Amino acid sequence: MSSQTLTAANVFVVLRQLRSLCYPIPSFASSQTIPSRAYSNYNAARHTSLVVPANIAIKQWHFAAAYSTAPPSKTAKESGEDTDLLEPTKPKPKKPVPAWAVQKNALKEKFKEGWKPRKKVSPDTMESIRKLHSMDSVKFSTKNLAEEFKISAEAIRRILKSKWRATEEEEIDRRNRWEKRKLRIQEQMMELGLRHTDPISKEGPSSDMESSHRNKSSSAIESLAGEYLSQSRGQESSPQKRRDPWDVTADDLPGTIRTSTRDAWPQERFPERRGSSQRRTRRDEYIERGPRGKPDW
C-alpha cells in the first residue's frame, strides 16, 4: 500500500507542475492552491511583485514559441501588390483631340436632336392656324397644331399670340412678288427640260406673260437642237439600203476605177447617179459600139 500511495503522490506532483507550466499562477514557488476567495479579495494594495524562477521562464518561453499564433510573414510578391495598391495611380496622358472632333462634340452637345432646321411658315398658313384654333381650341390645340404642321409648339404659341396683320397694300405686294417668283421658277425648270406643262392657272393678268415665256423656252430648245433634229428625222424617214461595192452591174465600164466608197464610183466622173430605169445593159453598149468597139472584159 505504501508503494501505491507514493506513486500516486508523485503523479499528483507531476500533474501540478504541468498545470503550473500551462496555466501560470501568482505563486509559482509554493505548490499550494489558492482558493477562489483570495482572487475576489485581491486589490492593488495587496499586490506583490511576481517572482518567477529562471528555468520556469525559459520553459514558458519555449512553450509560447512552439505554439505561436502570429500571422505568417508576407512574401515579396504579396508585399509588392500591396504597395502598388497603396500608391496613387497616375492618370495616363490623353491624346490630343483634333479640331474636327472638338467641333463635332460641340455640335452634338448643342443640337442633341441632330440636324433639324426650323421650318418656315407662309402668311397664309399662319392665318389658317389662327382660324383653326379660333374654331375649336380643344381639338386644334397647340400640341395638335404643332404635330400637324411639323413645327415646334413654341412657334405655334407665338403665331397665336401675335397680333400683327398685313395691310391691304402689303398683301397685294406680297401676292405680286409670289406670282413673279412662281413664273421665274417655272421658266428655269422649263429651260432645263424638267417640266413641260404649265401648272399655274391661265386665269388672271399673268396668262399672257406665261404663254410668252413658254413660247420663248420652246423656241430656245428648238434652236439648240438645230440641224441635228432635222438630219435625224430625214434619216429616219428615208433609210438608204447599203450597197456592196463589189457587186457587178451594167455601169461597170472599162477604165473605171474601183473604190471602197459606198457608191464605188468617182464623184467627178459620175456627178449624178442614174436611176434603175436609165441603166444601160451590156447588150445596148455592144450594139452602140459595134463589133470593133467591144470592150476588153
From Swiss-Prot:
Compositional bias of type Basic and acidic residues: which residue ranges? 265-275, 282-297
Residue ranges, compositional bias (Polar residues): 229-238
Q: Where is the protein situated, by its record's location annotation?
A: Mitochondrion
* Transit peptide location on this chain: 1-47
Tell me the InterPro entries matching this sequence: NGRN/Rrg9 (IPR010487)
Pfam families with a match to the protein in the record = Neugrin
Region entry Disordered: which residue ranges?
71-97, 189-297
Principal location class: mitochondrion
A GO cellular component entry from the record: mitochondrion
Keyword vocabulary terms for this entry: Mitochondrion, Transit peptide
The cross-references to PANTHER family, in alphabetical order and at most eight, read:
NEUGRIN (PTHR13475:SF3)
Family named by the database record: Belongs to the RRG9 family.
Q: What does this protein do?
A: Required for respiratory activity and maintenance and expression of the mitochondrial genome.
UniProt name for this protein? Required for respiratory growth protein 9, mitochondrial
